[in-house]
Amino acid sequence: MSDVTAAQRVKLARAVSRPGAMDYINALFTDLFVCKGDRLHREDPCVFGAIARFHGKPVTVIGTRKGRTFEEKMKYNFGMPSPEGYRKAQRLMRQAEKFKRPIITFVDTPGAYQGLEAEAEGQGQAIAASLALMSSLSVPVIAVVIGEAGSGGALALAVGNRVILLENA
């Protein structure tokens, strides 16, 4: 596939047929205990977070969801997390640090939501706080880029000891 153009690779990264975060999470992890909300404002369904088991070991798993149908895309804001989503992820990361659980993230986002409401609710600060927190964690962090990884919105969930990019991501 060395003759694939950059534009074709972008199309491949955005393909609806690509496995999403939940496909990987449901295939790899057991005993999921889903965590919702940022404890400040509201739940962002775009960012999924759970405590789970990977080969019997407890881990924290975080992923961005885009959806496949129009209804799902609307529900998940087309894969663009809000400040609440980043704060939920931070809450889970702090909890993972406290209980010494490794963190695994699955990133597929065109970037953070850019709406006026998101900016008013502290989108830039939420992204910066995620970057700072992830870079200071003592637990192992594996970040897997499974599709798009646009701008700081993706970086906020992709700082890790190991960063894995899937082909055409």
Where are these regions (language model features)?
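Terminal-region recognition feature
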Residues: M1-L155, V159-I164, N168-A169
